[in-house]
A protein has these predicted regions:
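Membrane-interface helix termini and inter-helical loops of multi-pass transporters
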Residues: 27-41, 144-155
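A glycine- and small/hydrophobic-rich beta-loop-beta segment
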Residues: 29-48, 55-63
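Transmembrane alpha-helical segments and their short flanking loops
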Residues: 121-122, 126-132, 136, 142-159, ...
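Membrane-helix interface "capping/anchor" motifs
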Residues: 61-72, 115-123
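Central hydrophobic cores of alpha-helical transmembrane segments
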Residues: 71-79, 125-131
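Transmembrane alpha-helical segments of multi-pass membrane transport proteins and ion-pumping complexes
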Residues: 13-26, 49-61, 77-89, 103-115, ...
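Structural signature of hydrophobic alpha-helical transmembrane segments
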Residues: 36-51, 92-104, 162
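Short, small-residue-biased leader/transition segments that mark boundaries at the very start
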Residues: 2-5
Length: 186
């Protein structure tokens, strides 16, 4: 059953990125760098926190999560994703390492909150880290593959793959740290 879900997730990601690439070709759009915005550090952190909260909350609601669960996931996701983004920008951490630390943070926070919110840990952690899935990296990889810029495409795909692998590893490591029964093989 797990392999079926993995294949479905892969198909969804590929179809979404391919659709975005085709629309970009039709509309003559191409990926560009981010616009430089002059904000003090506190402003960046606050806006990233708010955007992360809204993104995770919206994702949770879109998949029919009850409001209390969506708020819990959004709170965890806002903290974890803001930490991830700040690690990349302020400390120049590799994006995959920052994703691992972000997912680890989300997993630890979910473990601390699970009894208070009354939902299983996985119900809170999955929506809280979906915002960390590297959609932009996948899009840039697919776009560059489509225009036959293979070296650039491989770079974006490799970065995306490392981040995608780091997310569940962060959650697993958090579970190992916080759940004594999960640490041992029976």
């Amino acid at each position: 059953l797990g392999d079926v879900y993995k294949r479905q997730a892969l198909i969804i990601i590929l179809v979404a990125t391919m659709s975005a690439w085709i629309m970009a070709l039709i509309l003559h759009l191409q990926p560009v760098g981010f616009i430089k915005i002059s904000l003090p550090l506190a402003g960046w952190i606050i806006f990233r926190f708010l955007a992360s909260f809204c993104g995770v909350f919206g994702f949770s609601i879109m998949f029919n999560s009850p409001i209390p669960l969506a708020v819990a996931a959004a709170s965890i996701g806002a903290i974890a994703n803001t930490l991830r983004l700040e690690l990349v920008d302020l400390v120049n951490a590799p994006p995959a390492a920052a994703a691992f630390i972000g997912a680890l943070t989300a997993g630890i926070l979910a473990s601390l909150m699970k009894d208070r919110v009354g939902y299983p840990r996985i119900s809170v952690t999955v929506p809280s880290i979906v915002i960390m899935v590297p959609g932009l990296y996948l899009y840039r990889g697919f776009y560059n593959l489509g225009i036959m810029s293979l070296a650039t495409s491989a770079t974006w795909f490799a970065s995306a793959l490392l981040i995608i692998l780091a997310l569940p590893l962060g959650l697993i490591f958090a579970r190992i740290l916080t759940d004594k029964t999960f640490r041992y093989c029976t």
